[in-house]
């Protein structure tokens, strides 16, 4: 018995029904849960897979190890694609992704308004959809336009009626599992925050762009994520 995330991911991959997997040259995985580790092992039978070994504690020793894994992955990509990834390229990517995360965080924080400006499903679709854009550089501007439009309409009185405000936490939500949000909102509630891997959990704590060691900065940002595989997992409690 495996969780729906593992079953659906592997099912879409092996059945060749996922266009993203179909056109991908390489899959990068990570050692989070046992189910995903076994999934990547089986995926490697029909697609190149590189697995990053993720520490299970947010200690300084874990940070050193995670930094080495990031560098190892960078070197693997260079060898696999026959390219050179410079530090300047890394810093440019860090800056862009910081801007993207900040714009999406600002979007999610609109749900602090009471009554809520829009449904939580709409926000989640926007956050999820941002991951599948071909031109990432335009994402912050597009998200800002959406924020401005929502706020303009809110000031005009266009918003939801007062509803019970719901926090959703737990496993990632996307695709068919959006029905969880839909069920809540079709029955009179409004999902104002989604605290999971596909929600606000990844949007805080930007990578420190001015850090002399950019790889350590990247490692520190991602290792601090309040993921359920971490023990202890105080960062998740703090986020909630």
Where are these regions (language model features)?
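Trp/Phe/Arg-rich N-terminal binding region typifying the photolyase-homology
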Residues: 1-87, 193, 197-198, 202-240
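A charged, amphipathic alpha-helical module
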Residues: 75-206
């Amino acid at each position: 018995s495996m969780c729906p995330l593992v079953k659906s991911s592997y099912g879409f991959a092996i059945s060749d029904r996922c266009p993203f997997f179909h056109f991908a040259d390489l899959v990068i995985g990570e050692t989070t849960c046992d189910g995903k580790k076994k999934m990547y092992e089986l995926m490697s039978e029909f697609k190149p897979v590189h697995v990053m070994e993720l520490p299970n504690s947010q200690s300084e020793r874990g940070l050193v190890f995670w930094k080495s894994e990031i560098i190892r992955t960078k070197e693997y990509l260079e060898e696999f694609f026959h390219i050179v990834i410079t530090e300047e390229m890394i810093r440019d990517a860090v800056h862009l992704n910081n801007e993207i995360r900040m714009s999406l965080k600002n979007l999610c924080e609109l749900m602090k308004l009471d009554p809520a400006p829009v449904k939580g499903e709409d926000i989640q679709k926007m956050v999820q959809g941002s991951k599948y854009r071909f031109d990432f550089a335009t994402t912050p501007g597009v998200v800002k336009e959406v924020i401005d439009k929502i706020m303009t309409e809110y000031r005009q009185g266009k918003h939801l009626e007062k509803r019970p405000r719901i926090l959703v936490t737990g496993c990632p939500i996307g695709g068919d599992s959006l029905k969880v949000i839909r069920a809540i909102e079709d029955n009179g509630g409004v999902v104002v925050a989604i605290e999971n891997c596909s929600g606000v959990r990844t949007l805080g704590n930007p990578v420190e762009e001015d850090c002399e060691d950019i790889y350590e900065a990247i490692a520190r940002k991602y290792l601090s994520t309040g993921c359920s595989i971490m023990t202890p997992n105080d960062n998740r409690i703090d986020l909630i």
